[in-house]
């Protein structure tokens, strides 16, 4: 994502983040929580949902983000994301640990080439 900001500027980068946020928000339930966590990272809390039931949803969101062309002011960019998931209480009962495990899972996705989803071990 840094390359988008460096190439097209932060205003365009912000536009892309807003569009990604919209895609995520449109694909989760109203009781779920979507938030930006850090520069270009998002956290999604799927309330009362088994982690195995989250996989198809996460894969759907990853595909929708990759399918969209982010077009503004004559600039068109396509992007992919790497997602990592952890579940309460399966992987931990600590928010800090859950975020850390989801982060490690995200890096596993990146090591596999990105544009996908991995679950914490």
Identify the meaning behind each predicted range.
Residues 33-36, 77:
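A short pre-motif secondary-structure segment
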Residues 26-31, 63-75, 106-108:
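Short catalytic/binding micro-motifs of nucleotide second-messenger systems
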Residues 38, 81-87, 119-121:
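A general secondary-structure junction signal
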Residues 45-54, 73-76, 81-98:
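Catalytic strand-loop-helix junctions within cyclic-nucleotide turnover domains
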Residues 2-26, 35-39, 43-44, 51-59, ...:
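Conserved long alpha-helical elements within nucleotide-processing catalytic cores of c-di-GMP signaling
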Residues 55, 88-120:
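Catalytic-core segments of nucleotide cyclases and related cyclic-nucleotide turnover enzymes
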Residues 3, 33, 116-119:
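Conserved beta-strand positions that form and line the central face of beta-propeller blades
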């Amino acid at each position: 994502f840094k390359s988008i900001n460096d190439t097209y500027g932060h205003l365009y980068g912000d536009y892309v983040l807003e569009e990604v946020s919209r895609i995520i928000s449109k694909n989760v339930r109203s009781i779920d929580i979507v938030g930006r966590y850090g520069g270009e990272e998002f956290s999604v809390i799927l309330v009362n949902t088994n982690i195995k039931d989250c996989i198809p949803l996460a894969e759907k969101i990853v595909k929708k983000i990759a399918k969209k062309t982010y077009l503004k002011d004559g600039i068109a960019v396509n992007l992919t994301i790497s997602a990592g998931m952890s579940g309460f209480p399966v992987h931990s009962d600590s928010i800090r640990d859950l975020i850390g495990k989801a982060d490690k899972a995200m890096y596993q996705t990146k090591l596999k080439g990105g544009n996908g989803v991995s679950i914490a071990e």
